[in-house]
């Protein structure tokens, strides 16, 4: 994990402390109408409230534990490689791509 920009460091800090849920995520700078897509679950949400209710509700329901494997920054994108373990012990390899806007905030996220 090389030297990262402030927004990439904020994302990294959240991923290393993801057990703090939405409270930890809310410390990351985000555009007010940011979007998150999780194609495997058919989730397409927009804004703080929908992300909190849909995404973090789902993560809580499945008992998700996130392990940050690597984080890479390339231009206006930050990519996180994760192992996500659910309450039944199943481990998923997840790639999250964060698009950063020109104000240094998360503008869009894809969880693949």
Segments and roles (model prediction):
Residues 22-23, 48, 103:
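Residues at or immediately preceding the N-termini of alpha-helices
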Residues 16, 40-43, 85:
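Short histidine/acidic/glycine/proline-rich micro-motifs that form metal-
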Residues 22-27, 43, 70-71, 77:
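Short, flexible segments with low predicted structural confidence
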Residues 43-50, 90:
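Generic, well-ordered alpha-helical segments
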Residues 1-33:
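Short acidic-aromatic low-complexity motifs
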Residues 33-45:
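A short gly/proline-enriched turn/hairpin at secondary-structure junctions
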